[in-house]
């Protein structure tokens, strides 16, 4: 079981540390809501992953691998990320962003939901689970049954919590040293990154 756990941990780290829309959103919320935002966001991400594991064992992976599903996810997800990114850029240009805590956007429920939705909007994330993740799950299930799957999921999601939590803690605790103008530039840049990912998803759909 230790091999399954550490394999899941290593594989998840390799994916979590790659730049993507979820990391971009985590940095943005850490600046806005504080050092613990990443943990809440990844909790939403974890709920989606747990749901995907259940659906995959029900045969849903076939649907996720289909061209039509990938196209729909890419188009809808791409448009969602473009909208979020554009909103960040526009608010930065209009000087509507501020470092102070935004209670509405910082509610745990909102960040939890966003972690779920942003992950679901990423067609590459869903395809990874439908292909690569499925292979690991099958091996874990063959060796140790449901316990093996649980061990794999635990190792996988622990890596996400460690990485995104660390990023959130670092960004959230240093935000007080960031000047307002620099903060607006950072938010605009992060918005541009989301637009880039959204455009990529949409184009590849």
Predicted regions span which residues?
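Juxtamembrane transmembrane-helix termini in multi-pass membrane transport proteins
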Residues: 2-71, 131-151
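Hydrophobic/aromatic residues within the transmembrane alpha-helices of Major Facilitator Superfamily
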Residues: 13, 17, 86, 120-123, ...
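Alpha-helical transmembrane segments and their lipid-water interface positions
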Residues: 22, 48-60, 81-87, 91, ...
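Selective transmembrane alpha-helices of multi-pass membrane proteins
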Residues: 66-97, 156-167, 175-205
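Flexible interhelical linker loops that connect adjacent transmembrane helices
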Residues: 93-110
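Selected transmembrane alpha-helices and immediately adjacent juxtamembrane segments
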Residues: 108-132
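Alpha-helical transmembrane segments and their membrane-interface junctions
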Residues: 124-140, 201-204
